[in-house]
Amino acid sequence: MTAFVTKPVRERLRSTIVAALFCVPVGGLVSAVWAQDASEWDAQNHTAARLIAGSQVAGSDTKIVRAGVEIKLDPGWKTYWRDPGDSGVPPKPDFAGSDNVKSVTVLWPAPERFPDGAGGNSIGYLDHVILPLRITPQDAKEQSSLKLKLGYDICGNMCVPVESDLKLAINGDGAEEMAIEKAEIRVPRRVALGEGSDTKGVKGSGGKGLAILSVHREPGDGHDRVIVEVSAPASAPVDLFAEGPTPDWSLPLPELKGGGNGPSRQFTFDLDGLPPDAQAKGAMLILTAVSDDDAIEVPARLD
């Protein structure tokens, strides 16, 4: 089995699908088992994980079934996004051994930034998260059986590596559809540079949501600096995360310049953490802007 990871894992304990995804081809045909709505919880110290089943995706030329990885954490505990930030390790889903599964796409809901306890910041989820899955079966006429080995780190007053083994038979008729759809709403939408998201529900937006207006590079002390202009509804809190074109890029977390809660915000970060011989000019970055009610993902090529 091979896995294609779209976002970087930081080599020095710093680590971002289109629409945020792992795409994992797997194989085999399912044996006769009853489809389920959810697996049993795998409960461990300070956390528990399970698989949940949803419905078939409508309007697709091929059969695609929704599912999800649900992780619960003790109050105040956290786990990590695909790019964990200054410290941490992202979840590592492995679907090898699944039956009647051609591929699995993992979607990543918008994360948040939090102190890592060592003077830096991590990126991830507090208390609870559902990672939506899109399952493509090998044989659309048969049900599928997911087998997931999930490695993930959790942190509270200490950090603990966790490994869960989960199984779930699915057929596109699961009862956890609403929970999965709610998580999918928070998955950043892919839009072009300068293009705003369509978020009529954002208060004060007038129907206009987030937009990343411009990205440019300028000389800095020791490293070039990237300047990102973000448009957002006035007073809406916004954060920004930056990822490189390959997993060995380890970009710093962007910082908001001058505070500001107006319709235009400026974020900056140094071009630090590049792999040896990497060229910044022409590199394609992935920028993710997140507010309380909206999230977008923008591919942006450096000048």
Give each language-model segment a name.
Residues 6, 31-32:
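A subset of signal/propeptide-processing and intrinsically disordered low-complexity segments
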Residues 34-303:
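Extracellular/lumen-exposed scaffold segments
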